[in-house]
Every structure is written in structure tokens, then in C-alpha cells.
Amino acid sequence: MRALLGLLLVFGGCTFALYLLSTRLPLGPRLAAAGEPEGRSLWFPSDLAELRELSEVLREYRKEHQAYVFLLFCSAYLYKQGFAIPGSSFLNVLAGALFGPWLGLLLCCVLTSVGATGCYLLSSLFGKQLVISYFPDKVALLQKKVEENRNSLFFFLLFLRLFPMTPNWFLNLSAPILNIPIVQFFFSVLIGLIPYNFICVQTGSILSTLTSLDALFSWETVLKLLAIALVALVPGTLIKKFSQKRLALSETSDIGHPDRRKDA
């Protein structure tokens, strides 16, 4: 009970801080043009239409308040990652639209790693018993696979990040239970999610620059789409290479779907 109360206290404090950041905005050019008061708040996008609207608002607002937009974006990203809240893919796309393809990619990789490590620490301090209570079978299966691959643990962690059937939120929550060293955990997230982050950020960069259908077929856009396609092939190639040479992976795909496992 004390652990749950501690977690709720931390969550409430972070939620309140993010609320203040998103509702106490300095008046920007777009807000001033619309004649809106300073109490305007921002929101987490839930679909592409909201994402595009938010991107337009923040890009205009960033002209006069670049540091504030950067702080707000980083805070929102770490909030979602730290508390394992779905929807970080929208923020990756937003990063590409706001900061461009390369700065956006660097920012997302760092924030993903820091946020996931924050989730690791929160789980270690407050959530171990909750995770074990709610997901006993998943924890047991993942524990078994971690022990089987303990001698090549870092490559196994990379595999779990690259493998699309493995839920990242569960890996973040269960890692301290499995005695995964925090340094290996951090760098496996930093490296393993580069392809995923690249695809999302490049998508945001493309969407932010399109003004017509003709722009979709420009050489710059075509090259970006080609780069996305090539990067999308990386996880499968790495999985095939490392799974054949170094890892014991017979049941890993069932971690997120225990009902798919066959009876022994």
C-alpha cells in the first residue's frame, strides 16, 4: 500500500507540473492573433488530425518561445515514457515536424532512453509487487528468457527492442524485477529503438513540409521515403542474424501474448 501511495504521489506531482506548463503559456503570435487569453492549454494528440493541428500551433508559437516549446515537449515526452502511457509515437512524429529530421531523431532517442530509465526506476521503487501481481505469467516467461540469454544479455535486450511483438512498456516495468543492469537497459533502449524513432520522426518531417500532392513526389520526399523503407528492414535483419548465432528465443514472441503459447 505504501508503494502504491508513493507512486500516486509522484504521478500526481508530475501531472500537476505538466498541467502548469501547458496552461500557463506566455502569449505567442498565433494566440495573440486569435485574441485568446494567456490561459490557453495544449493537449496530447490522439489522431493525425489533432497532431497536425498541434504541430501548426507549436511551430508558430516556437518563433517567439523556442525554449519554452522545447521544455514543454521534453516534459510531455518524459511524462509519457516515465509512466508507461501509450502515445509516444505521436510525439515522435511531432518531433520531426517541430525540430526537423536529425535534431528530432537525436532528441527522441535521448528522451526515449531517459524516460524508459525513469520508468525502470519508478518500477524499482514502487511497482515491483504490482507488476508481479498483475502480470505473473509474463514476468515468469520473460525471466526464463533473460536467464537463458544472461551471457549475451545486451544483445537479447536489443532483440526485445527491435522485435515489434514485444511491448516496450512491459519491458520498462519488468526490467528491475529481472535484475537487468540499468546501464545495459539504458543503452539497449538508446540503440534498439533508433529504427522505430527514425521512421516516426522522418514521417513527421515529411508531413510538416508537404503543401500539395506535387510535393509528395519531389526528389527530397522520395529519398526520405526510401530511407524510411530501408531502415524498416533493419530490425528483421538484425533479429535473424543474432537469433541464429547468439540467442535462445524460442518463446520470446509470446511475452506480449501469453495465450498464444502452446501447451507443453
From Swiss-Prot:
It is a multi-pass membrane protein. The keyword Cell division does not apply. It is found in: Membrane. It holds the Pfam family VTT_dom. Residues 1-17 form the signal peptide. The chain crosses the membrane at residues 67-87, 100-122, 153-173, 175-195, 219-239. InterPro entries: TM41A/B, VTT_dom. Belongs to the TMEM41 family. The VTT domain was previously called the SNARE-assoc domain. As there is no evidence that this domain associates with SNARE proteins, it was renamed as VMP1, TMEM41, and TVP38 (VTT) domain. This is Transmembrane protein 41A. It comes from Mus musculus.
